Every structure is written in structure tokens, then in C-alpha cells.
């Protein structure tokens, strides 16, 4: 397909490759090789690692995480090579301050996984690294895909899309993010669209002061463009038969932060100690990613055991929430779901929990649902993420007669949230950095003169540098978070015995409710769930139990097997979800509501007001991770990764425009921008 062929923004076009007589992949679009026919690995090491003074710089580096930016991912050769060298460095210098390598790369036309595997056969010495990359290589969905490898020692942010669109979407503060640039890609003569002043300026914008840069080309316009952007560039000897290449350093940073002040995100310097309030899957995911970064984590759970709230169900469906628009909803949930699969699969290597990647089938059970799902399919997502099924295919996939059309999420499935949450906490308990406080209900948050947070129970007070409120609908317990515009939603899920017909259900079935396949260990299914806004009653309701069964029979009215669903033994579980008006979570700094209301009262007079605009007022060191709703299993892992990245000052794996859609102050800001009162 031509590189100029324009598709909807939810779609990314895979590269079309041919293989030359040397077995090297060649791009059809650019008529250029992905790496040198001769000694491609050695060329990578010379051009990009050695000319960026690696690994020597790592020995002298005094920060926790070193960040490399790359302009063309291709087959991942540069990434694999630097991964190999960094792992050797960590082995040789285990006590060095530098613990983690973060690699940020861009690719407009990602190679397919099968082509990736074939290309990697050229470098057998990199096989152990290549296999891990292949295992978690993402579907062709736009924006950032985070891969966490080597238990957090290696992080890859792989941005799918045009680099000129992606680079400005990376959240950045005044200090910049990148320590070294690998300016790679097809030759400037083959890909002139990429090699331009916009690229060079964006590289400088994302770079820290002292950031180095190296590229294989010695083209004069590239050297002049990088110098104009602020890099001090020099010619150096090229690799092998190539006479010259260029390398250099950014001597001064002039670029400022790249986000609106009312969507600012801040953190405290050198955070080493974080408290998390809440005992569910959100807290478990966040604790996991913070511990990987060497942070001391204390989780406070009000119940005798974790996962007693909304994360306590026996079976929960895992699939993305998508729409046809290229907006915050799809742009978060598509990569969020892909990352959730990675997180859960990695957890399964050391945590035991019931789960089955059997797929999720969503029925077009009436005209409204059919219109909604057909509209969603116009988003042109890859089939690997979601596909359309006719009646025959639906019946075949479900394993029971349905006789209606559907959409199918082949990567989806179900898992036991309670087992996953408790298993993650149990695994973390082996780490001296982690403490789980059960039976510890926090009743108040206060900040002392040293800007430390005090968490008070009835009998104790605990002091921490930073706090994350992740306690679902109980966010109203605290003065600082009580005004967040979120709604509690009661849900009752029924546990039903399997039958000869229900045993045939092969996939999670979604309609105006959901039914899971049998958990063979217990010979039961879950069917649900009721949805009662602002209802906090945790008592069992027989009417909800009956309704859970009737909802399936209403949506699949012409088949016999739904009559086998028997909820009469009243086995059920009630939980309270927490939801936002726009169906997106809140993650980030907790906003000082009254101060923001006063500071931003004239925000709608934007032109005049912006002259004196200040960052949105927040509680320093106080964060939230709330309103995951009924999609917490699909969203919590990436939300945790994004929030941990913000807290620790790492690159954030979400576009700026999506981060705006997740900001805890967004609903207030939107009203103020329109000159409306804050009555939400």
C-alpha cells in the first residue's frame, strides 16, 4: 500500500516487506533496507551506541533511569542491541545509581509480527531479547504502546503513527526527557518527509540539556538542521566503508513544557515513599509498577483482606471500550487493553489466578446495539483487536445457538479479579519495599510543615512523601477529594451452576449484560450485572438476581438454552463501582477545588487571561486513580503505569490529548472554559 494512502486515524498500516538475496528486509514503500546487508548489528553498535558514548555515560550517570529516543523503530535492531549492552552494564555495575533503561521509538509503518520474527533470525546472539520483544509486540493500533521487560529494568515506548504527529504528543516538563537520540530511519533521499526541520526541532524540544545525538548520515542539510535546532554537531568517521557520519550534543535547552496550564501535571522531587489508599486491582497494579522503580510502597486497605470491594468478583471480562472516533476513549482503551494483556500475562508467570483468553463476543441483540457496534467498526480497528462476525461465525465462536450478528475481541477473555489482586499483593510481600496494612481505614489526610502527608486511622498516624487515593467510591472520605465529580454505581453479579448446555459456552458473551464461560474449577458461571447509580446498599436484592437472568432471555429470546440459567439459589456478590460522566478515569494530581475556582474564574476570557495563567492549583504529593468503572481490569495496568511515570518523572505512555481527558480537573475546566458555573 502506498505511504500516501490515508486511512481513518484509528488505523495504522503495516509495512510491506520483501527480502533481498542477503536475507535482509527491504521496504516496498521506501525501497530501502532496514539494516545493513553486512554487519548490521556492528554498524548499530558503532553508530548509535558508541557515538552516543555508551556504555561509558551509564557508568557516570547519577539518575535512576536513562532515556533514549529513536526516530525509526523498524525491526527493533537498535533497541535489542542497546538492551543487550545495558543488561551487561547492570551485571557489571549492580550498585550504580542507574537502574533502568527507557527506549522511546516511533514507527509510521510497523512491521508485522511474522516479519519481525523473520528479521530477528539474522542476529542469533540477540535471540533471548528478541523473543521477549516478539512475545509482547503490539497490534497495529495508533499512539504509544508500553512494553515493560526484564521486570522493569527495560521499558520500551513504541509510538505507532507519523513521527511529526506523535512527538508533540509526548508529555514534557521544562527539563525535557531524552538523554540520547538515535536519529535513524530510511535514508534521507528515500524518506524526505521525515528528515526535515520539524523533526530536528522536535528532537531538541524533547531532549534534556546535554542530550547526545548520532546518525548514520553525513548529509549537510541534516547537520545544518540539527545545529539550527540547538545541537552542536560534528562529522566523525563513518562505519566500515562509509567515510563520515555526524554526532553531537544539545548544549542548551530553550523549550518549555508542552501542555496547557489547566492540565498541568506535577510531582515532588526524588520521591522514594508512596502510600496507596485502597485494596483493589488499581492499588495492586500501581504498587507493582512503583516497586519496579525502587519506590517504597505502603498500601492501606480498610478491610480484613484485600479485594473485598469492586475487585472481589469471581470472574470479570477483559476487553476494550471502543468507538469510531479518534478521541480519548478509544485512544486510551485500545492501547490500555493491549497493555493489560501484557501485564496480566506477565503476572501469570508468578501469580496463580483463574483466567482464560477465550475471547469476548458482543451481540447485536437489538437495533440500538447493532447501530452502536456497526458505528464502532467504522473506526477501522485491526482485526486482531476487534472483528465483525456474521450469524454463522457467531454461533461457531460462542458454542451455543445465538442466531444474531456480533463483534468479537479475540484477545479478550475473563479472569478472577480477587485472585489476581491478592496474588499480586502476596507476590509483592516478598519485597522489603512493600507493606500491606489491612484493617486500616484511613479517616483523614493532612499535610505537615515539611510537606509530608499524614494518614490517620482511629488509632495511628502514618507519614509518607506522597499519597495516591485509589479507594473507589470511598474517595468522598477525604476533604481533599470529596468534590471530585464521580458517581457510585451499585452492581450485583449472580453466580450460577453450569448445565450440560451452558458448558458449551466458549467465549464471554456480552449483550445488555454478560455471561462468562464455566470456571471449570467451580462448575459455575457469572452473569450480571445490575447498574444502580448512587445506590450504596451492599445488601443482596432478589429482584436484581431475577433481573440478571431475565436480561439474557430478553436479549436472546428465540433460543432454548438461556432458560438453563438458574439464579434461584441466590448466590451473588454485590459491589460498588465508581464512574465518571464521560466514562474515563481520573488519574493525576488532586486539584484544590476552591483555589482553582477562584484562580480560573476568568479562564473563558482566554486571550486576556492567558497572559497571567498559572498551573492548575493542586495538593503537592497527593494523587488519585479513580472512576475505573466496570473496565478496571482493562484499564488499571496502563493507568498505573501512567501515574507511576508521572510521579517519578518518567516518560508517560499516553498522548497529551488523552492525558487531558484523564485529568482529575477536566470536567471543572471544561465548564470554566465555557464560562459556566461549577455545579457538576
UniProtKB/Swiss-Prot annotation:
- The transmembrane residues are none
Q: Where is this region: tRNA (mnm(5)s(2)U34)-methyltransferase?
A: 1-251
Record's Gene Ontology CC terms?
Answer: cytoplasm
- Judging by the UniProt lineage, the source's domain of life is Bacteria
Q: Does the keyword Coiled coil apply?
A: no
EC numbers for this chain: 2.1.1.61, 1.5.-.-
Cofactor list: FAD
Q: Alphabetically, which GO biological process terms does the record hold?
A: methylation; tRNA wobble uridine modification
Where does the record place it? Cytoplasm
Q: Which InterPro entries match?
A: FAD-dep_OxRdtase, FAD/NAD-bd_sf, MnmC-like_methylTransf, SAM-dependent_MTases_sf, tRNA_MAMT_biosynth_bifunc_MnmC, tRNA_MNMC2, tRNA_S-uridine_synth_MnmC_C
Q: List the disulfide bonds.
A: none
GO MF terms listed in the record are: flavin adenine dinucleotide binding; oxidoreductase activity, acting on the CH-NH group of donors; tRNA (5-methylaminomethyl-2-thiouridylate)(34)-methyltransferase activity
Entry annotated with the keyword Methyltransferase: yes
One Pfam family per UniProt: Methyltransf_30
Please write the reaction equations for the catalytic activity of this protein: 5-aminomethyl-2-thiouridine(34) in tRNA + S-adenosyl-L-methionine = 5-methylaminomethyl-2-thiouridine(34) in tRNA + S-adenosyl-L-homocysteine + H(+)
Residue ranges of the region described as FAD-dependent cmnm(5)s(2)U34 oxidoreductase? 277-680
Q: Which Gene3D superfamilies match?
A: D-Amino Acid Oxidase, subunit A, domain 2, FAD/NAD(P)-binding domain, Vaccinia Virus protein VP39
Keyword annotations from UniProtKB, A to Z: Cytoplasm, FAD, Flavoprotein, Methyltransferase, Multifunctional enzyme, Oxidoreductase, S-adenosyl-L-methionine, Transferase, tRNA processing
Q: Which family does it belong to?
A: In the N-terminal section; belongs to the methyltransferase superfamily. tRNA (mnm(5)s(2)U34)-methyltransferase family. In the C-terminal section; belongs to the DAO family.
Q: Which HAMAP family match?
A: MnmC
What PANTHER family does UniProt report for this protein, alphabetically? SARCOSINE DEHYDROGENASE-RELATED, TRNA 5-METHYLAMINOMETHYL-2-THIOURIDINE BIOSYNTHESIS BIFUNCTIONAL PROTEIN MNMC
Function according to Swiss-Prot or TrEMBL: Catalyzes the last two steps in the biosynthesis of 5-methylaminomethyl-2-thiouridine (mnm(5)s(2)U) at the wobble position (U34) in tRNA. Catalyzes the FAD-dependent demodification of cmnm(5)s(2)U34 to nm(5)s(2)U34, followed by the transfer of a methyl group from S-adenosyl-L-methionine to nm(5)s(2)U34, to form mnm(5)s(2)U34.
Designated name of the protein? tRNA 5-methylaminomethyl-2-thiouridine biosynthesis bifunctional protein MnmC
Q: Native species of this protein? A: Aliivibrio fischeri (strain ATCC 700601 / ES114) (Vibrio fischeri)
Amino acid at each position: 500500500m502506498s505511504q500516501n494512502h490515508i486511512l481513518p486515524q484509528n488505523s495504522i498500516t503495516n509495512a510491506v516487506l520483501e527480502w533481498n538475496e542477503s536475507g535482509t528486509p527491504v521496504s516496498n514503500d521506501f525501497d530501502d533496507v532496514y539494516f545493513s546487508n553486512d554487519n548490521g548489528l556492528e554498524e548499530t553498535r558503532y553508530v548509535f551506541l558508541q557515538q552516543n558514548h555508551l556504555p561509558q555515560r551509564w557508568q557516570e550517570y547519577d539518575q535512576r533511569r536513562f532515556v533514549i529516543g529513536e526516530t525509526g523503530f523498524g525491526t527493533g535492531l537498535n533497541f535489542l542491541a542497546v538492551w543487550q549492552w545495558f543488561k551487561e552494564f547492570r551485571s557489571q555495575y549492580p550498585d550504580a545509581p542507574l537502574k533502568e533503561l527507557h527506549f522511546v521509538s516511533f514507527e509510521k509503518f510497523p512491521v508485522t509480527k511474522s516479519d519481525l520474527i523473520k528479521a530477528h533470525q539474522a542476529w542469533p546472539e540477540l535471540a533471548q531479547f528478541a523473543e521477549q520483544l516478539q512475545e509482547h509486540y503490539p497490534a497495529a493500533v495508533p499512539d504509544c504502546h508500553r512494553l515493560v521487560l526484564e521486570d522493569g529494568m527495560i521499558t520500551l515506548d513504541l509510538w505507532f503513527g507519523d513521527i511529526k504527529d506523535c512527538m508533540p504528543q509526548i508529555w514534557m516538563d521544562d527539563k525535557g526527557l531524552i538523554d540520547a537520540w538515535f536519529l535513524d530511519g530510511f535514508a534521507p533521499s528515500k524518506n524526505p518527509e521525515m528528515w526535515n526541520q520539524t523533526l530536528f526541532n522536535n528532537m531538541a524540544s524533547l531532549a534534556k540539556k546535554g542530550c547526545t545525538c548520532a546518525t548514520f548520515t553525513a548529509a549537510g542539510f541534516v547537520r545544518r538542521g540539527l545545529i539550527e535546532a540547538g545541537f552542536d554537531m560534528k562529522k566523525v568517521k563513518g562505519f566500515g566503508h562509509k567515510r563520515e557520519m555526524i554526532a553531537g550534543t544539545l548544549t542548551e535547552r530553550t523549550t518549555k513544557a508542552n501542555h496547557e496550564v489547566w492540565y498541568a501535571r506535577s510531582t515532588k522531587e526524588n520521591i522514594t515513599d508512596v502510600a496507596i489508599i485502597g485494596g483493589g486491582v488499581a492499588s495492586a497494579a500501581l504498587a507493582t509498577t512503583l516497586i519496579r522503580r525502587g519506590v517504597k510502597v505502603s498500601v492501606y486497605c480498610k478491610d480484613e483482606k484485600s479485594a473485598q470491594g469492586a475487585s472481589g468478583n469471581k470472574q470479570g471480562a477483559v476487553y476494550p471500550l471502543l468507538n469510531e472516533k479518534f478521541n480519548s476513549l478509544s485512544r486510551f482503551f485500545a492501547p490500555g487493553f493491549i497493555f493489560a494483556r501484557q501485564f496480566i500475562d506477565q503476572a501469570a508467570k508468578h501469580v496463580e489466578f483463574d483466567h482464560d483468553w477465550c475471547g469476548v463476543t458482543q451481540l447485536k441483540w437489538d437495533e440500538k446495539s447493532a447501530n452502536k457496534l456497526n458505528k464502532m467498526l467504522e473506526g477501522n480497528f485491526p482485526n486482531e483487536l476487534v472483528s465483525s462476525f456474521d450469524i454463522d461465525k457467531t454461533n461457531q465462536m460462542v458454542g451455543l445457538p445465538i442466531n444474531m450478528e456480533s463483534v468479537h475481541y479475540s484477545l479478550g477473555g475473563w479472569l478472577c479479579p480477587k485472585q489476581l489482586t491478592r496474588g499480586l499483593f502476596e507476590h509483592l510481600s516478598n519485597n522489603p519495599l512493600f507493606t500491606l496494612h489491612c484493617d486500616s481505614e484511613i479517616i483523614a489526610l493532612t499535610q505537615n510543615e515539611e510537606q509530608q502527608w499524614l494518614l490517620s486511622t482511629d488509632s495511628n498516624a502514618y507519614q509518607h512523601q506522597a499519597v495516591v487515593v485509589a479507594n473507589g467510591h470511598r474517595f468522598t472520605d477525604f476533604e481533599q477529594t470529596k468534590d471530585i465529580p464521580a458517581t457510585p454505581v451499585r452492581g450485583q453479579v449472580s453466580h450460577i451452576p453450569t448445565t450440560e448446555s451452558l458448558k458449551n459456552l466458549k467465549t464471554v458473551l456480552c449483550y445488555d449484560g454478560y455471561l462468562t464461560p464455566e470456571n471449570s474449577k467451580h462448575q459455575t458461571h457469572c452473569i450480571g450485572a445490575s447498574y444502580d447509580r448512587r445506590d450504596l446498599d451492599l445488601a443482596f436484592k432478589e429482584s436484581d438476581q431475577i433481573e440478571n437472568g431475565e436480561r439474557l432471555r430478553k436479549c436472546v429470546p428465540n433460543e432454548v438454552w438461556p432458560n438453563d440459567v438458574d439464579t434461584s439459589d441466590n448466590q451473588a456478590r454485590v459491589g460498588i463501582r465508581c464512574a465518571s460522566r464521560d466514562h474515563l478515569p481520573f488519574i493525576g494530581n488532586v486539584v484544590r477545588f476552591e483555589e482553582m475556582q477562584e484562580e480560573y474564574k476568568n479562564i473563558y476570557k482566554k486571550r486576556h487571561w492567558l497572559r497571567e495563567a498559572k498551573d492548575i492549583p493542586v495538593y503537592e504529593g497527593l494523587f488519585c486513580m479513580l472512576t475505573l468503572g466496570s473496565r478496571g481490569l482493562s484499564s488499571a495496568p496502563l493507568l498505573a503505569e501512567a501515574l507511576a511515570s508521572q510521579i517519578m518523572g518518567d516518560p508517560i505512555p499516553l498522548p497529551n490529548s488523552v492525558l487531558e481527558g484523564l485529568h482529575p480537573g477536566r470536567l471543572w475546566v471544561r465548564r470554566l472554559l465555557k464560562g459556566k458555573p461549577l455545579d457538576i
